[in-house]
Amino acid sequence: METVDTSERLTRLRQLMQERKVDVYIVPSEDSHQSEYIAPCDGRREFISGFSGSAGTAIISMTKAALSTDGRYFNQASKQLDSNWALLKRGVEGFPTWQEWTTEQAEGGKVVGVDPALVTPAGARSLSETLKKNGSSLVGVEQNLVDLVWGKDRPAPPREAVRVHPAQYAGKSFQEKISDLRKELENKKAAGIVISMLDEIAWLFNLRGTDIPYNPVFFSYALITPTTVDLYVDEDKLTPEVKAHLGQDVVIKPYDSIFADAKALSEARKQDATGAAPKFLLSNKASWALSLSLGGEEQVEEVRSPIADAKAIKNDVELAGMRSCHVRDGAALIEYFAWLENELINKKTTLDEVDAADKLEQIRSKHDLYAGLSFDTISSTGPNGAVIHYKPEKGSCSIIDPTAIYLCDSGAQYLDGTTDVTRTFHFGNPTDLEKKAFTLVLKGLISIDTAVFPKGTSGFALDALARQFLWKEGLDYLHGTGHGIGSYLNVHEGPMGIGTRVQYTEVPIAAGNVISDEPGFYEDGKFGIRIENVIMAREVQTTHKFGEKPWLGFEHVTTAPLGRNLINATLLSEDELKWVNEYHAEVWEKTHRFFENDDYTRSWLQRETQPISK
């Protein structure tokens, strides 16, 4: 992880700020679709700050610069930021939020600027109200100033072809999905809905793309009314197959024309003499720029996207695909970890973290329906495992130490599903502390996996189950316990999840949700432990049914051994020990057929799935 000298970039940015009479400028991580993962052309925050993590906000005043990020990235940011930058540790006492820092820099009637395409209306309103209290103001700066600094070196926007996602994997036609959406519009008495989240558009139309690394989406907007369907996308990306799939009912319009069309809709609504024209729905994650084009608060109803809610509840075909792809993915992981142990221990091969990650990708790519990785593989040895979202890079990454803990968080895209799995192994002799920490984390994973709870329970409520064993020791981890996972879509999706985010209190876990279960523990400078399975919520039978409501539990689909020599069986209850042994028996049963002609991997798998006892 190298530090980038940002002095020249900041000088140029401040010149542009001065020309536009902006005193403080905000650079969010997101693109104009509020995407978590972004295309290289949208990496503005990384370009201006040098920090390459996926989450964070940069704020630049005329004399200072600050970068705010969360606990996953404190170590990484401290290494990558140069002396021009202050690191604001989100959620840590003594550090201001980026909003507080911005307000402090803007005291005395100063102007704060931001590209309105990169923030939500709610975010803009909240900051604007805070700034007003000290006489300052927030303005939208439509021409992105970082783009001007970047100039001709900025990567070109992607122009790859869009593909049809067949019904055999989608499980439902796009016409049915739009029909369901129109029922929602009718229920809300809405004029229509403008959609800007890329995974929602890909899911709704049963299309996939490659515009953003690891996320099979394409740059687009959509406008759905009770009688029309408009898809805003660069038509050059649409193959004859895609056009035939969409048919005559979907009108294709230029990508950028959404803003002009939104303004026209807003003007038409203003002309309504009755003053009672229905509003358009807009996701509360859409951009401030889109909201302004539609006429702002008065003409738009900001809602949690009904498409996000529908997408999060997988249909039977999608759930079957998830089960199937996780077995193939598990086989790839088994082959990989067996290979890695053989190279490190038996052959004494020198391998760095990237060599190992590349090998895992090569193994995965042999499996049916493979369509690429779902995120950058986190291949980390020893102390690098404590960097929660560590990204190894050739030339600066570490050689894998066979006497240290090795943490690998990885995932893949398959046509029938998306995977995300973390395994922590030690190919030598782990210390008592490492075994204790691993076992406490494992107990948390099992606690979520075996949870039974009434319908209506949120992931916020479940989160403490995963942390309870660490908490008893005065330990914790600085990330969520679980996030939603797409079906051959984004590896991170909402609206539900397991963690302490306020939004998780608002959305209960529902049957059909696919979520990660990933507690961890990190000893800075020494090692990191995380165990992650993908689980699917489903209705379960209980002896009683208090309140006459359905009760839910989980089904795990990840099939890979847990790292047997790191488990301290004396710390497990009888039920937990039974769970581990049954899980390993299931892994063997589902995956050993892949290794009929690979004696080494088969024997490794047999060893790693043997029952353990106290």
UniProtKB/Swiss-Prot annotation:
Record-stated family: Belongs to the peptidase M24B family.
Catalytic activity: Release of any N-terminal amino acid, including proline, that is linked to proline, even from a dipeptide or tripeptide
Keyword flag Hydrolase: yes
Pfam families, sorted: Creatinase_N, Creatinase_N_2, Peptidase_M24, Peptidase_M24_C
Molecular function GO labels: metal ion binding; metalloaminopeptidase activity
Sequence positions that bind Mn(2+) 2: 409, 420, 532
PROSITE patterns the record matches: PROLINE_PEPTIDASE (PS00491)
Cofactor requirements of the protein: Mn(2+)
Cofactor note: Binds 2 manganese ions per subunit.
Top EC category: hydrolase
GO-annotated biological processes: proteolysis
GO CC term, one of those recorded: cytoplasm
Name of this chain's protein: Probable Xaa-Pro aminopeptidase P
Transmembrane regions: none
Keywords annotated in UniProt: Aminopeptidase, Hydrolase, Manganese, Metal-binding, Metalloprotease, Protease
Entries under InterPro entries matching the protein: Creatin/AminoP/Spt16_N, Creatinase/aminopeptidase-like, Creatinase_N, Pept_M24, Pept_M24B, Peptidase_M24_C, Peptidase_M24B_aminopep-P_CS, X-Pro_aminopeptidase_P
E.C. number(s) listed in UniProt: 3.4.11.9
Organism whose genome encodes this protein: Aspergillus niger (strain ATCC MYA-4892 / CBS 513.88 / FGSC A1513)
Residues at which Mn(2+) 1 binds: 420, 518, 532
Keyword hit for Cell membrane: no
Its job: Catalyzes the removal of a penultimate prolyl residue from the N-termini of peptides.
